[in-house]
Amino acid sequence: MGFHTFDADDADRLERASVRYRRVSAEEVVGPLAGDGAGVLADLGSGTGFYTDDVAEYADTVYGVDVQPEMHEYYREKGVPENVELVASDVSDLPFADGELDGAFSTMTYHEFASPGAVAEVARVVRTGGRFVVFDWTADGDGDHGPPVDERFTADDAVATLEAAGFEVDSASTRTETFGVVARAP
């Protein structure tokens, strides 16, 4: 399961607000992160910066982390907010110090990096008590949209992986095609 990467040639599809916000609203991502004063955050799998832009309004700094340089190129052409810094990196080897981030989020990209090692890396870089917000396609969905079902995870899978890395899960929910998990770093 997992490790499906979105085709950068189709990056325009990631900017369709009417479609994306039906799956995950900006408020669902921003709310858990802005509640404690957002500070320094990382968008893991930032792509074109669609959700990065929403969160940037409430944060001092947001690192847009993506493994595909083409996604950063698209984002630069679109326009990157002043408080967003683009970082080319795999989630399993993040270039941040221990506890450097006040929080992190991943919208529809968890399946691209969801290994115990990558989640442990997120736990390393997010300060104790900082939130990690995950929304992704669920393996319980029909697969009409998003990655193939056999490359997805369930909310229970994500909770188990996060808890194994020391995260304390605040909430987990499943919808028709997506799941959401909000957790706090150890």
Where are these regions (language model features)?
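C-terminal alpha-helical "lid/dimerization" subdomain adjacent to the S-adenosyl-L-methionine
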Residues: 13-20, 131-182
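Class I SAM-dependent methyltransferase SAM/SAH-binding core
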Residues: 42, 47-93
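A generic alpha-to-beta junction signature in SAM-dependent methyltransferases
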Residues: 34-35, 56, 113, 126
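A short acidic, Gly/Pro-enriched loop at the edge of an enzyme's catalytic core
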Residues: 92-103
